[in-house]
Amino acid sequence: MKKLFISFMALLCTLGAFAQSTAENINQPKAMKPIIMVVPEKAWCINQGFVKDGDPKSPDYEKALLNNDVLNVITKMGGIMQERGYPLKNLQSALDELKNESAMDLALVSKADGEIVEDEFDQLTRVAQTDILVNIAFTRTTYGPRNMVEFRVTSIDAATSKQIGGETGRSSASGAPISALLEESVLGFIDNFTGSIQRHFEDLVANGREGSVIFKIANDCPLTFDSEVNLNGDTGELNEVIDYWMNEHTVNGSFTQNGKTRNRLSYEQVRFPLFGKGKFGGKPKAINMDGFIKPITQFLSQFGLSVSTTPVGIGKAYVVLGGK
């Protein structure tokens, strides 16, 4: 009887430990995954003739998506990424959203002024608010009724345009649709490909997204970046005060000042958090560089300055200082 009681108690302990382990696994948050957008590779679009009218060096993604093979390949690659848990931003939806963005007409200065220029690709990544771009290119070789297709995919950080990873694959010669040939080629390397993306994104979560900021002095600004100002009882130059703000707000104080004149101040390798505080006590929300740097406008107003910010893509922003 005593042995039976001991065995029963041991069973209860085992079941309790299993239940606790199961509850912990259920409550454990899932790993965050970056938002992906699949796009045809820029060089591939140009080589295939999918370019803007009158500008043979600028890809036209709208034209590319009118091609059935391109559309099928992008749709299939997006589906493969979604199956692995990656949120997907649709390229066509982003293009449509960009066309409907009326604020773009007011935000930027023309190239002739030598000021802030945002090309269409920067506009696209800003509107899409995607973390990673998956560029895809393919070459079809025909053998009678059969096709063999070579694919090239690269992952790009949307904020910096730096390559994260890249893979190539080749299908067997087959009469199957191009989407099936893509799947055959990609499945051999997809784990390595998505693994490099996930490692990069986990670094962004831990150490911040990388970007750049350029400060400029407007004609009506009463100060230059060499002007002396007072802050917290200390005296220093305006550029030093901006350095102070950057050090206080970047992730781990990570940034590099890579250029300074009286009227221009630039920073690279600026690590800013993926999420910022929501207004009015709201939930944290995903931010781009413009969202990160915008609070400096209030900080600089104490020196009699009016400050405006303009985003370029998701990883770059211009900050213009003027007089009140």
Predicted regions, residues:
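C-terminal/domain-edge helix-coil "capping" segments
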Residues: 20-35, 40-48, 162-254, 313
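Amphipathic beta-strand/beta-sheet edge segments enriched in Tyr/Trp
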Residues: 131-175, 318-323
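N-terminal segment of the mature soluble domain
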Residues: 50-127, 133, 236-275, 281-302
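Short, flexible helix-coil linker/hinge segments at the edges of structured domains or between repeats
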Residues: 94-112, 156-178
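Envelope-exposed proteins and targeting segments
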Residues: 32-34, 84, 129-134, 147-152, ...
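Solvent-exposed coil/turn segments that connect beta secondary-structure elements
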Residues: 41-44, 93-94, 139-141, 154-159, ...
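Bacterial Sec-dependent N-terminal signal peptides
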Residues: 1-23
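C-terminal basic regulatory modules in eukaryotic proteins
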Residues: 291-324
